[in-house]
């Protein structure tokens, strides 16, 4: 049968995100959330949720002009953030020590880190004018690219440690260009080369890295921007992009795909029968080879985890049946 996996955050208060470097209570709550979640639903694939350490705190408060971007430095492996991230990952990895499930570490693209670090920055998708970076795009895109390269160096160093020292099986790299925030030429020239570099570097240590093309809160991406990324599997917002799993398989050269459920749709509020029916629809449309069933993004933190088991049981029953006649097309899932 296909593997089934869903991920959700463990900190209910968004203001606690990123406080784990200094706040032990928030840090411990983040770790303990994995233990509690596993008792409720033991996934076929696990991911370390680093809520308390989102996002990498690159120092960029001094940036006032595009030229200042060239002064940004990569985060040191001896930083408090790096040390806490390694501790969190090792301890969460221990929670899954007796599991056969591969365990992934969450990683974010250089631009996501940079946009969050700038004086007017916001976590993309959470609002904020971001007028500073928009001005930099126009004034000196090369400086923006140089900053992305610098930030990527710290990300790559952390990812190497996560794989080699913490024992994670791969990196789950989150990227996006939601709503065309960066013009296509800018993205392809100054942004994506360093996202690819992060992924390619991780590929030297693991052959199961996943690319998550984040469509958070319904803001879409042009998936064609990501066809040149060399991931083992791809996850995107099927419902926002209007690109089904089978269509994604073709778009990404036959690579494995992950997802299918809208996180706040039938999975969150449907009956068991509706959830099971939708699981069958996903598998009828995408097939079982090269497919992992999950969601477009993280599911709501308050979801009833028994619903996730409904999906797995449906996948088990689906696999046990004789070859099914395809009843659904991709449009029925949108």
What function would you assign to each model-found segment?
Residues 9-11, 51-71:
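A short glycine/small-residue-enriched secondary-structure motif
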Residues 1-11, 16-21, 33, 44-48, ...:
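Active-site loop segments of alpha/beta catalytic cores
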Residues 31-55:
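Membrane helical hairpin/interfacial module
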């Amino acid at each position: 049968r296909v593997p089934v996996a869903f991920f959700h955050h463990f900190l209910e208060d968004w203001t606690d995100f990123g406080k784990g470097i200094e706040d032990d209570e928030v840090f411990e709550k983040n770790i303990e959330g994995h233990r509690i979640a596993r008792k409720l639903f033991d996934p076929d694939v696990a991911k370390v949720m680093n809520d308390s350490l989102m996002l990498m705190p690159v120092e960029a408060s001094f940036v006032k002009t595009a030229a200042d971007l060239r002064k940004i430095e990569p985060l040191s492996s001896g930083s408090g953030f790096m040390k806490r991230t390694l501790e969190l990952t090792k301890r969460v990895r221990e929670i899954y020590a007796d599991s056969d499930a591969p365990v992934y570490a969450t990683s974010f693209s250089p631009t996501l880190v940079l946009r969050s670090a700038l004086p007017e920055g916001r976590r993309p998708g959470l609002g904020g004018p971001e007028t500073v970076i928009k001005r930099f795009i126009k004034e000196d895109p090369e400086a923006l690219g140089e900053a992305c390269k610098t930030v990527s160096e710290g990300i790559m160093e952390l990812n190497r440690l996560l794989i080699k020292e913490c024992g994670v099986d791969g990196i789950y790299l989150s990227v996006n260009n939601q709503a065309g925030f960066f013009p296509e030429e800018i993205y392809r020239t100054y942004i994506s080369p360093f996202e690819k570099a992060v992924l390619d570097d991780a590929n030297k240590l693991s052959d199961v890295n996943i690319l998550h093309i984040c469509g958070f809160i319904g803001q879409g991406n042009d998936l064609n921007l990501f066809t040149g990324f060399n991931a083992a599997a791809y996850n995107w917002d099927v419902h926002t992009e209007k690109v089904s799993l089978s269509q994604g398989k073709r778009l990404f050269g036959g690579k494995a795909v992950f997802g299918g459920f809208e996180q706040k749709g039938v999975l969150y509020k449907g009956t068991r029968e509706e959830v099971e029916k939708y699981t069958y629809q996903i598998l009828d449309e995408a097939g079982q080879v090269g497919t992992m069933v999950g969601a477009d993004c993280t599911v709501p933190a308050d979801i009833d985890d028994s619903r996730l088991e409904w999906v797995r049981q449906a996948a088990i029953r689906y696999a046990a049946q004789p070859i099914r006649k395809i009843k659904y097309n991709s449009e029925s899932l949108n």
